């Protein structure tokens, strides 16, 4: 007997999303729901290899969404202050575990915030911890809470070489931050100016190109050895930049890297759905309070944890590739990180449900991806 998964919707306000957002996202559902296919899909329990859960009271609001569907998630370290040491990662991990619902099996996989001053000794401590999987490279100023990030990759070489030696993974936010580079070109320029050189300098380093958004990134990843892989978000395969900008600005679709033109969306979608082991699921679910998004200077980030797997199912179904969802969501990431594939399964059923307009978020509210829209897939549990 399969029972509908009970997601933590207490306090969620079922308000309609802004009309412009409803129109943009409604077009996605109209396309997907017209695609024929099976009404039930069972896959190995998945992992999310890129997740933000924030800190303090906000953790308890968002962790249950992920923990009830995914067995593991790679937790980003860009809190305030950032998670820079193994000791800090352990303390953060305990906060996250305290927010996991009773009876739910979920293991947060931790990362350290790489800085110009991260030492080889800290890398050794991280590798010995058993719960730190890698270090996150944020170019200083590239995204939320990245001001303490890396100013020059060359300053990190001792730490990166130690990571390669010990098998820790480097997770990369792949954008330059030069004021002279156009916002939509930051990823491409990063590949040319930074990542291509890094791959050559530390050839044994395992690298994840996080939340790739361009055809350039897809081709770069494919051209590298098995030590380079990439994660892909739901918004970057379901939407292009028109969804955010045409007919009015939709702040809840603003994220970094920013949504790109349609040709890039098509290329990234093909990479995600095509069965290539180099690409795997990483939502980059990044909640912000509603007021911080609906602002004259709004924060970057899309909150998608409430329905992450159904969003990917929508995209894979649209491409006629539902049979490849399991590898993308459950196999490729675990294999790359060198951890066992999960035991157990998760089942999705084709059963539409209305996404709430808001969810409670640590005493505030967060507006989720596809707020107020009908989502055609639902996760159920055995």
Predicted regions and their residues:
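Short, acidic/polar
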Residues: 56-63, 117-127
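His/Asp/Glu-enriched, well-ordered alpha-helical/loop segment
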Residues: 274-341
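N-terminal chloroplast transit peptides
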Residues: 1-20
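Active-site neighborhoods of metal-dependent hydrolases
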Residues: 232-298, 346-382
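Divalent metal-dependent hydrolysis catalytic cores, especially in the metallo-beta-lactamase
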Residues: 48-49, 62-88, 103-115, 131-145, ...
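Histidine/acidic residue-rich metal-binding segments in metalloenzymes
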Residues: 30-32, 37-38, 122-137, 145-281
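Histidine-centered catalytic micro-motifs
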Residues: 45-56, 170-176, 232, 283-285
């Amino acid at each position: 007997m399969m029972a509908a998964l009970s997601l933590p919707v207490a306090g969620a306000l079922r308000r309609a999303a802004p009309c412009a957002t409803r129109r943009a996202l409604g077009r996605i559902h109209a396309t997907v729901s017209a695609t024929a296919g099976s009404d039930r899909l069972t896959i190995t329990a998945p992992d999310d290899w890129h997740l933000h859960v924030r800190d303090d009271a906000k953790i308890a609001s968002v962790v249950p969404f992920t923990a009830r569907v995914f067995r593991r998630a790679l937790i980003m370290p860009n809190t305030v202050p950032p998670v820079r040491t193994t000791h800090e990662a352990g303390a953060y991990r305990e906060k996250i575990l305290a927010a996991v619902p009773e009876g739910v099996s979920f293991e947060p996989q931790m990362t350290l915030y790489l800085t110009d001053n991260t030492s080889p000794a800290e890398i050794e401590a991280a590798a010995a911890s058993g719960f730190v999987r890698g270090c996150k490279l944020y170019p200083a100023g590239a995204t939320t809470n990245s001001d303490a990030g890396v100013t020059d990759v060359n300053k990190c070489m001792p730490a990166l070489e130690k990571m390669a030696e010990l098998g820790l993974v480097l997770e990369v936010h792949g954008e330059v931050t030069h004021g002279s580079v156009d916002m939509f070109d930051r990823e491409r320029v990063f590949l040319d100016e930074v990542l291509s050189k890094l791959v050559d300098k530390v050839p044994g380093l395992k690298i994840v190109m996080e939340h790739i958004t361009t055809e350039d990134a897809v081709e770069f990843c494919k051209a590298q050895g098995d030590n380079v892989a990439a994660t892909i978000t739901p918004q970057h395969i379901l939407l292009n930049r028109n969804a955010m900008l045409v007919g009015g600005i939709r702040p809840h679709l603003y994220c970094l890297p920013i949504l790109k033109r349609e040709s890039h969306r098509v290329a990234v979608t093909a990479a995600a759905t095509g069965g290539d082991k180099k690409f795997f699921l990483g939502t980059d679910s990044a909640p912000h309070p509603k007021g911080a998004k609906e602002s004259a200077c709004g924060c970057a980030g899309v909150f998608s944890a409430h329905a992450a797997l159904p969003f990917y199912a929508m995209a894979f179904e649209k491409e006629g590739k539902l049979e490849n969802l399991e590898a993308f969501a459950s196999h490729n990431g675990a294999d790359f990180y060198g951890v066992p594939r999960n035991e157990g399964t998760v089942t999705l059923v084709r059963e539409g449900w209305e996404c709430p307009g808001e969810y409670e978020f640590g005493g505030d509210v967060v507006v989720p991806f596809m707020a107020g829209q009908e989502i055609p897939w639902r996760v159920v549990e055995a």
